[in-house]
């Protein structure tokens, strides 16, 4: 019984790690990392800071996906985030969901 539980736990951990890596790869693929890093402000805010700012917002993933696709200005300073028209709706949602998991 203990072995089965440990196996399930290990499989779950690998699944979560794979999900996190897949969306980090998605951020690289869509060139998000040119302006954003997980821990550090570059041109745009650190992704962990974005996650913290919107952690309690009910529709945070939808809101962030819209910002990823449509861009924004004045939210995090003077440098605007350009729209990312080549990012699919599904990828924008996956990126937003991933960002919100960062602590």
Swiss-Prot record:
Keyword Signal carried by entry: yes
Keywords on record: Electron transport, Heme, Iron, Metal-binding, Periplasm, Signal, Transport
Signal peptide: 1-22
Alphabetized InterPro entries for the sequence: Cyt_c-like_dom, Cyt_c-like_dom_sf, Cyt_c_ID
SUPFAM superfamilies membership: Cytochrome c
Post-translational modification: Binds 1 heme c group covalently per subunit.
Protein's cellular compartments: Periplasm
Coiled coil: none
Cellular compartments per GO CC: periplasmic space
UniProt-annotated binding residues for heme c: 32, 35-36, 81
Major site of localization recorded for this protein: periplasm
Source species, domain of life: Bacteria
Pfam families in the cross-refs: Cytochrom_C
Molecular function terms from GO: electron transfer activity; heme binding; iron ion binding
Subunit structure: Monomer.
Function of the molecule: Monoheme c-type cytochrome. Probable electron donor to membrane cytochrome oxidase and to periplasmic nitrite reductase.
UniProt protein name: Cytochrome c-552
Species annotation: Nitrosomonas europaea (strain ATCC 19718 / CIP 103999 / KCTC 2705 / NBRC 14298)
């Amino acid at each position: 019984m203990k072995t089965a539980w440990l196996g399930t736990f290990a499989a779950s951990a690998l699944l979560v790690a794979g999900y996190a890596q897949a969306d980090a790869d998605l951020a690289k693929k869509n060139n998000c990392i040119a302006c954003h890093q997980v821990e550090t402000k570059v041109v745009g805010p650190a992704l962990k800071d974005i996650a913290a700012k919107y952690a309690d917002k009910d529709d945070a993933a939808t809101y962030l996906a819209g910002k990823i696709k449509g861009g924004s200005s004045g939210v995090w300073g003077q440098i605007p985030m350009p729209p990312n028209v080549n990012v699919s709706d599904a990828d924008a949602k996956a990126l937003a969901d991933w960002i919100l998991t960062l602590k």
